[in-house]
Structures are given as structure tokens and as C-alpha cells.
């Protein structure tokens, strides 16, 4: 090979590579323009994507996806079936977020506790609502919550992207009817009595069967605010509860974490979660965790 032949061959190779690159670029532009950038998705006769699972579609909160959900009330408890978390993974995610959020309020500096948390019912409302949101960077900045390990999010739906909007809690009696989505049957606020009667159901009066995320309810007769609640959780693997004491004689309450054995041995018998205590209503569970479809 002569000294001039080698550079000439390299030039030919370079030109060939450039030509191939341009050809590939033109081909991709042609496919994009004529295909309009669409992905191939099989659709039903109604025009809705058939490839998306119900859970995945529901997470987008579109009118079409919610129309495919069951607007029924299998248990007649006032909660629509489209809100029930039927996937065990979703149930576990909700329980983890619900208890983590509630417990965090009890260990953070008092000045950082959200101002809306003033009693036991408000702790339930706040933790329930926040557990069902999307937990992205914006959420962490807004709540000031810091976690070492983050659970997965609920996938079925997220607050407030449902037909109920921001109105999360059932406040009217009766089974769910489709018109309840807009007639005031649901609201953003519900007191402890309404939470236990309209948004949760009795599981047992044996506290040993309670799971993290379950609720303990009491009715202390003779008090101006007789309904009280606690959230079942774990402290270092041991059963425990977290709750807000609420205002007492003009003095603001405080958030407490108590191991279950200590609660069972409470110096005031009316607070012991035992079947023989008439003030203890039992272990309750949120309606959205009730049964499977």
C-alpha cells in the first residue's frame, strides 16, 4: 500500500459512516412524522385503551377510568367500592404510610406539628389524607416529614384525584349511591364519632388481634367530647398506639406513643382496651380496607 492510499481509505470509511448516520436520522424523522409519535395501544369499541390495567388506569384519575370502576357499595357501609384498596400491596402501603405519618407527629418538635392537629380525630384525618397522597419531593417539602426508608405509594388511586375530590370522609348515614359524590354525603372534616360510625367498621374487641393502621375507639361518658381514638402501630416491633390527648381544661393536648402493655395497665381503667371495659368500643378498621371485590 502506498503512503497516499491509507488516508484515502480512511476518508471513504468516514464518509460512509456519516452517510449511514444521516440515513438513520431521516428514517426516524419519517417514522415520527407519519406515525405522529403514537404508541400502538389496542383500544376497546368505546375508544378506551384496553392495554391499561384497571389499577393503572385509575391512578390517572380520568373521567373514563373512574367510569369503569364499581360505583357500588358491597358492604352497605357508605363507602364506594371504587375507593376500597383490594390489592394487598396497596393495603400494606396505606397502613405503612398511615402509621408512619401519625408516629412522626409524635416525635417531631411540637412547633413543627401541623396546626390542624389538635385532638385525636384531627390526627386520624391528617394521617389518613396524607397517606393517600402522592409522596414526591413536593409532598416532603410541604409536610416537613423525613424518612429513612420510604414505602411504596398506593397505586389504585391517590387523593384528591377521585370523583369525591377533596371530600374524603363519609358524613351522612346510609349506603353509597352514585349521587353521593356530589350531594354533600362526603366532606373534608369528620369528628371522631363520624369517623367511627361512617368511615370504619368493628373488627374485634380483642386488642391482641389489632394490626398496624387499625384504630381503637373509646366513648368516655360524661365528657364534653366523649369520643376518642388511637392508632395502632409498632415501636421496635412491639405493639403500641399513638394518639393526641386533646385539649384539657383549656390546656392544649399532646401527642403520645405508648406501648400496648402499658396501655393495658393504664392507671385509669376506662382507658384500658379490654372487653370488660364498657368505655372501650373495640378495634376498628378503615372502610377502604374492608374485604375484596
Predicted ranges, named:
Residues 14-29:
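Hydrophobic membrane-insertion alpha-helices, especially the h-region
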Residues 9, 35, 44-47, 176, ...:
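Intrinsically disordered, low-complexity regions enriched in polar/acidic and amide residues
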Residues 148-251:
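...with weaker cross-activation on analogous glycine-rich loops/strands in unrelated enzymes
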Residues 1-9:
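N-terminal Lys/Arg-rich, disordered targeting/topogenic segments
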Residues 240-293:
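Low-complexity, Gly/Ser/Thr/Pro-rich intrinsically disordered linker/tail segments
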Residues 49-186:
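N-terminal capping segments
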Amino acid at each position: 500500500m502506498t503512503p497516499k492510499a491509507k488516508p484515502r481509505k480512511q476518508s471513504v470509511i468516514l464518509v460512509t459512516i456519516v452517510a449511514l448516520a444521516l440515513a438513520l436520522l431521516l428514517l426516524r424523522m419519517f417514522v415520527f412524522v407519519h406515525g405522529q409519535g403514537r404508541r400502538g395501544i389496542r383500544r376497546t369499541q368505546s375508544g378506551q385503551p384496553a392495554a391499561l390495567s384497571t389499577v393503572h388506569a385509575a391512578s390517572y384519575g380520568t373521567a373514563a377510568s373512574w367510569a369503569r370502576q364499581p360505583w357500588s357499595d358491597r358492604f352497605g357501609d357508605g363507602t364506594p367500592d371504587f375507593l376500597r384498596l383490594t390489592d394487598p400491596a396497596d393495603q400494606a402501603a396505606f397502613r405503612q404510610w398511615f402509621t408512619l405519618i401519625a408516629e412522626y407527629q409524635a416525635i417531631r418538635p411540637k412547633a413543627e406539628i401541623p396546626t390542624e392537629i389538635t385532638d385525636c380525630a384531627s390526627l386520624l384525618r391528617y394521617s389518613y389524607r396524607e397517606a393517600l397522597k402522592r409522596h414526591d419531593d413536593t409532598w416532603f417539602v410541604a409536610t416537613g416529614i423525613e424518612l429513612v426508608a420510604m414505602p411504596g405509594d398506593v397505586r389504585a388511586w391517590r387523593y384528591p384525584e377521585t370523583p369525591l375530590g377533596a371530600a374524603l370522609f363519609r358524613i351522612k348515614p346510609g349506603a353509597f349511591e352514585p349521587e353521593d359524590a356530589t350531594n354533600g354525603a362526603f366532606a373534608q372534616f369528620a369528628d371522631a364519632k363520624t369517623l367511627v360510625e361512617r368511615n370504619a367498621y368493628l373488627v374485634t374487641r380483642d386488642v391482641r388481634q389489632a394490626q398496624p393502621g387499625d384504630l381503637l375507639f373509646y366513648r368516655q361518658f360524661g365528657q364534653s367530647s366523649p369520643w376518642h381514638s388511637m392508632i395502632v402501630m409498632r415501636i421496635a416491633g412491639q405493639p403500641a398506639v399513638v394518639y393526641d390527648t386533646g385539649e384539657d381544661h383549656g390546656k392544649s393536648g399532646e401527642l403520645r406513643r405508648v406501648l400496648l402493655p402499658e396501655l393495658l395497665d393504664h392507671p385509669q381503667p376506662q382507658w384500658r382496651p379490654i372487653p370488660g371495659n364498657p368505655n372501650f368500643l373495640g378495634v376498628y378498621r378503615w372502610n377502604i380496607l374492608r374485604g375484596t371485590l
